[in-house]
From Swiss-Prot:
Record-stated family: Belongs to the FBPase class 1 family.
Pathway assigned to this chain's UniProt record: Carbohydrate biosynthesis; gluconeogenesis
Keywords: Carbohydrate metabolism, Cytoplasm, Hydrolase, Magnesium, Metal-binding
EC number of this enzyme: 3.1.3.11
Principal cellular location given in the protein's record: cytoplasm
Keyword Oxidoreductase: no
Domain of life: Bacteria
Organism lineage string: Bacteria, Pseudomonadati, Pseudomonadota, Gammaproteobacteria, Oceanospirillales
One GO-annotated biological process of the protein: gluconeogenesis
Identification of the protein by name: Fructose-1,6-bisphosphatase class 1
């Protein structure tokens, strides 16, 4: 079986990008080790401060962010990083080739109950002869050269695309390497599973409420078939399920908090997941445009997200 370095070396992936991916995934292995320690290492619970999103940080949010930041800014191929947990971008090496944006610990509210979490990352090639600025980082998702996530579940898995399909790697703790276990993953175009936080239904648009009501009505409704609902409360877990067995994930626009009409971050969550889904034959949209076509206006910009099985995304958009 091939491990991650072998797969990248046998592809058209540039050596400098291989280096960035190696640093990223090696750090995720260290994060996985830290997660396994849990209460034994005193790393659960709140850190006692908020991030730029106005969210209370968990101790492991801060720990995982610092681990990735320190490792990546030391990588000669990295020009700058942006993190969900950092107020501003962090310039690294002026002669580096790549920007990397990441959510160091997606689903961190799950940490204290020992449920699924993950690290999401997005990589762009962007060279220059001056220190990087936030304006340099505002690149549409269609320009990503790689995207992926590491899922910390019963096994630790890496899901990765470099623009030539989606591969899944399982971490082998005896060898401390990611080994290729699922190649060229494809998402079925039709589905009978959906993932959405139903507690927010009253805040959605009328069109979205109508769509979800039709799913819930099942065979007795206009869809003529039953649907199951799933919700992990971590985007990384819900998207992983869709890549493994199909479905649609929706975090729609809502009016619960007008300052955060979209919940998920474009740069750290929506763009990398959209690239993965499209590479696997799915679709990713906001309800007004393709996610990968969005011109970012700020590194912490939020958007609505509808992604998954191509035909079901189209059906949702038709409402």
């Amino acid at each position: 079986m091939q491990n991650l370095p072998d797969v990248l070396a046998s592809s058209a992936t540039p050596k400098t990008l291989q280096d960035v991916l190696a640093v990223t995934t090696d750090t995720c292995i260290a994060i996985s080790d830290a997660l396994k320690q849990g209460s034994l290492a005193g790393i659960l619970g709140m850190a006692g401060n908020e991030n730029v999103q106005g969210e209370e940080q968990k101790k492991l949010d801060v720990i995982s962010n610092d681990m990735l930041k320190d490792a990546l800014i030391s990588c000669p191929s990295v020009r700058a990083i942006a993190s969900e947990e950092e107020d501003y971008i962090v310039p690294a090496n002026t002669d580096g080739e790549y920007f990397i944006a990441f959510d160091p610990l997606d689903g961190s509210s799950n940490i204290d109950i020992n449920a699924m979490v993950g690290t999401i990352f997005s990589i762009y090639r962007q060279t220059g002869d001056k220190p990087a600025t936030e304006a340099d980082f505002l690149i549409p998702g269609k320009e990503q050269v790689a995207a992926g996530y590491v899922l910390y579940g019963p096994s630790t898995m890496l899901v990765l695309t470099t623009g030539d399909g989606v591969n899944m790697f399982t971490y082998d703790p005896t060898k401390r390497v990611f080994t290729l276990t699922h190649e060229k993953v494809q998402v079925a175009k039709d589905t009978q599973e959906f993932a959405i936080n139903m507690s927010n239904q009253r805040f959605w648009s009328a069109n979205m409420q109508s769509y979800v009501n039709d799913l819930v009505k099942g065979k007795e409704g206009s869809r003529g078939k039953n649907f199951n609902m799933r919700w992990v409360a971590a985007m990384v877990g819900d998207v992983h399920r869709i890549l493994c067995r199909g479905g649609i994930f929706i975090y729609p626009w809502d009016n619960k908090d007008p300052s955060k009409a979209g919940k998920l971050r474009l740069m750290y969550e929506a763009n990398p997941m959209a690239m993965l889904l499209e590479q696997a034959g799915g679709k990713a949209h906001t309800h007004t445009q393709r996610i990968l076509d969005i011109q970012p206006e700020a590194i912490h910009q939020r958007v609505a997200v509808i992604l998954g099985a191509a035909n079901e995304v189209d059906k949702c958009l038709s409402y």
